[in-house]
Amino acid sequence: MRKLILPCLLATAFAALAACSSLGAVGALLGDSLSFTAPQLQGYLDRRFPRDYDKLGGLVTLSVLNPRLSIPQGSSRLRLDFDVGFGALGRDSRTPSGHFAVASGLRFDTGTRGLHLDNPTLDSVDVPQLGGAMNTTGRELINRWLEDYARDEPVYQLDSGLMERIAARRIDATTIENGQVVVHLGQ
């Protein structure tokens, strides 16, 4: 009988942990916050890119490729690096033409159940084909994309199971602390 108890307890414990979609879900059940790591957010982004956006009435296609998310040590903002391609007049937009980097806070959006960029800033742009500098049209395209993306697209989406477990809780704030994204829960 004793031999059966230990395996049953272990199986129950593993099943309970597996039911939590992330380590942050355990915190939601036990505490007042959810925590997410940069690799968790990166995994979500990897499934959502590359993305193509037709701009200027379809004359130009902006392709945003290869997202790389990091949380710089001691920072309250995350960093997103992207490759970018511009397609026009037969040029393939999926061929990287350059790179840009964004710094941003995060906010929770109830409509998408996701973490969205909050007050993103375009930190750097490098387009070697333009001599390393970005012309006004290219910068405008990236800034328009960034505004649309921050408004409409999450960089991470909480799954239905996690949302069910925290349904009785209110999301008070989203911060970046000690290299992690922290969603603070209220009553």
Task: Write out the residue ranges for each language-model feature.
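Sec-dependent bacterial lipoprotein signal peptides
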Residues: 1-20
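Extracellular/lumenal and peripheral-membrane lipid-interaction modules
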Residues: 20-187
